[in-house]
Amino acid sequence: MLNGKTALVTGSTSGIGLGIAKALAAQGANIIVNGFGDADAAKAEIAQAGQGIRVGYHGADMSKAAEIEDMMRYAQSDFGGADILVNNAGIQHVAAIEDFPPERWDAIIAINLTSAFHTTRLALPGMKQKDWGRIINVASTHGLVASAQKSAYVAAKHGIVGFTKVTALETAQTGVTANAICPGWVLTPLVQKQVEARAQKEGIPVEQAKRELVLEKQPSGQFVTPDELGALAVFLSSEAARQVRGAIWNMDGGWVAQ
């Protein structure tokens, strides 16, 4: 379905980004990996998911505009540009507003929000020239609702939601679409560690700890998975989604419906 297309997925060496990259690869897209995790392992997983595709890597620090610009030049020179751009890179810090370190605020806004502006502004000219492109911003349920202690993350994710809508309006009469995915709790290695710590602290089975953690926010009592988010990204990249523009699609087990 995506043969001949190239997808650049930021923050794709693990978790959600890796799941999305593998799903796009399985549909024939070449993949450019980015992130601070094990790049070789991620590239191997992605290559296995998509037989015969090309997989590249650029280790741009998404808080630095100059490195993002270098990554986008790499995408253009080595792959002919990014046809599908998935802005997924993100970090988190939890603290009350009055205790929130200003440098952590700046880093979260830079990586979770400003990086998407830089990748988008640099990808759009090529997409418009081809009259085809897909921009998928990985926001969060925290782009729609808030939780205490997460001021920077919530601000950044609300910003991504607004930025997605503006991008969709500015590309509405082109073959380029822009949409956002808002995951709830996702079962990633980082979250699994939180589950295991809770189980140990409370002396309960891991499965019980997992369910209790999820039920605090998600009525379904089940985690979203990177594979499920990957399937949604594939749909948003498809021709069937050519008129899906500016959608803010939550996949959250009912979190935001409450």
UniProtKB/Swiss-Prot annotation:
Its EC number is 1.1.1.30. One of its GO terms (biological process) is lipid metabolic process. The active site is at 153 (proton acceptor). NAD(+) binds at residues 8-32. Substrate binds at residue 140. InterPro entries: 3-OHbutyrate_DH, NAD(P)-bd_dom_sf, Sc_DH/Rdtase_CS, SDR, SDR_fam. This is D-beta-hydroxybutyrate dehydrogenase. CDD domains: HBDH_SDR_c. Keywords: NAD, Oxidoreductase. Belongs to the short-chain dehydrogenases/reductases (SDR) family. PANTHER family: 3-OXOACYL-(ACYL-CARRIER-PROTEIN) REDUCTASE, 3-OXOACYL-[ACYL-CARRIER-PROTEIN] REDUCTASE FABG. It is an enzyme of class 1 (oxidoreductase). It comes from Cupriavidus necator (strain ATCC 17699 / DSM 428 / KCTC 22496 / NCIMB 10442 / H16 / Stanier 337). It catalyses: (R)-3-hydroxybutanoate + NAD(+) = acetoacetate + NADH + H(+). GO terms for molecular function: 3-hydroxybutyrate dehydrogenase activity.
